[in-house]
Structure formats: C-alpha cells, structure tokens
C-alpha cells in the first residue's frame, strides 16, 4: 500500500469513526432526553394523583358523617328510640325519611385516575407497590363500597314498594317530599315503628349500612397510605 492510498484509508477510517461516534452520541442524547421527559411525566402523574386525592378530603369526611347519621336513624327505629324530636332535628331542607327510603351515594373525584387508564399513562408508574396501592384505592376498595351501596339501594326500593302496596293512601300524599307536613310525617313513622315487615327490611338495610361504613374506613386507611407514599 503506497503512502497516498494509506493516507486515504486512514482519512476515511477516521471519518467513519467520527460518523459512528456522532450517531452514538446523538442516540445517547436522545435517550437521555426521552428519559427526562418520562421522568417529568411521572412527576406530573404523581402530582395530579396527589392533588385529586387531597381534593377529596372534605368530601370523604362529609360522607362519613352522612353514613353515620343515616345509620343512627335506622338504628333508632329498630331500637324504638327514635323520637319525634329527633325526627325534627334531621338536616334542614331534607326529608327525615331519607335514611329509610334512600341511600347515601359515594362519588369521590376519579377523573385523573380514569384519564391515566384511558391514555395508558398509568403504565409509566414504575413502583409496583405504588401501582398496587393506587389500584386498591381506586378499584378494589372503591368498588367494594359501590357494590354494598347497590345492595342497600335494593332494600330501600323494597321499603318504598312496601308503602305502595300496603299504605297507598298515605303514599299518594307524596310523604317523602312533603316533609314539612309534620302530621303526615309522624303518621308514616308510626307505621314504620309498628310494622314488623317494614322493620325486617330495615334490619336488612342496616346490615348493609354497617358493612358500608366499615368499607369506607378501609378505603380511608388505604387512601391515607397512598397519599403518604405519593408525598415521598
């Protein structure tokens, strides 16, 4: 190999290595940039989930109070300790018959979680422990409460049907909504207190209310643990 040829070989070899090195560096920089973008997305996911959970704090506290109040009224009926005075003290602008014929709903904000599932961002969360706890709060514990509420709702519908079938004259007076008619409300309570069939329905209802309250406590504990983990 003459000097001129050797010179070209060295030149092109160096150029080749420069090109390869440039491509490698470019890929490295691109990978670093992508990883940084993913880290920023993960941080945003954590921050948004934390904000959503903390925004529900007041709602969860209020729901616990509502669960306990409704339970207290049904329990009072079954123990024959529900007085007309207590009936009057039921929360303003709401029917005191609600504990017996309706169900307290449970609708904490879930939009961030649902969005993460829909766009696949949930898979960006790396920690298996964190993902499992998020699923516990947003799926397992949440669905447990919802399923119990649905069962309780069926009993509430049966209680309403009881009055349709057995006390249609009072039912047609729309007693559930005419709660300002004290005489009508008291007559409904007298039926409820003295009818064993209706009380049997309330035994069913209060059993679901007890389980529901316990499920909400479990939900709250898991939720608090999730908030603590997200803040780390």
Task: Outline where the language-model segments fall.
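Long, hydrophobic alpha-helical segments that serve as membrane-spanning/inserting helices
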Residues: 1-6, 10, 31-232
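Hydrophobic membrane-insertion alpha-helices, especially the h-region
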Residues: 13-27
């Amino acid at each position: 190999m003459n000097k001129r040829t050797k010179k070209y070989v060295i030149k092109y070899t160096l150029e080749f290595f420069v090109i390869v090195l440039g491509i490698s560096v470019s890929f490295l920089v691109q990978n670093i940039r992508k990883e940084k973008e993913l880290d920023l997305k993960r941080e945003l996911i954590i921050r948004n989930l934390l904000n959503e959970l903390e925004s529900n704090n007041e709602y969860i506290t209020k729901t616990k109070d509502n669960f306990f109040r409704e339970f207290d009224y049904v329990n009072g009926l079954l123990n024959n300790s529900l007085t007309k005075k207590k009936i009057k003290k039921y929360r303003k602008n709401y029917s005191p018959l609600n504990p017996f014929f309706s169900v307290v709903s449970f609708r904490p904000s879930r939009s961030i979680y649902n969005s993460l599932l829909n766009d696949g961002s949930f898979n960006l969360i790396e920690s298996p422990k964190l993902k499992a706890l998020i699923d516990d709060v947003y799926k397992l514990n949440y669905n447990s409460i919802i399923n119990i509420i649905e069962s309780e709702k069926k009993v509430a519908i049966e209680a309403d049907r009881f009055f349709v079938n057995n006390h249609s004259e009072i039912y047609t007076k729309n007693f559930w909504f005419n709660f300002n008619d004290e005489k009508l409300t008291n007559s409904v309570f007298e039926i409820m207190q003295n009818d064993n069939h209706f009380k049997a329905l309330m035994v069913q209802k209060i059993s679901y209310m007890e389980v529901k309250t316990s499920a909400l406590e479990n939900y709250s504990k898991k939720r608090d643990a999730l908030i603590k983990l997200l803040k780390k």
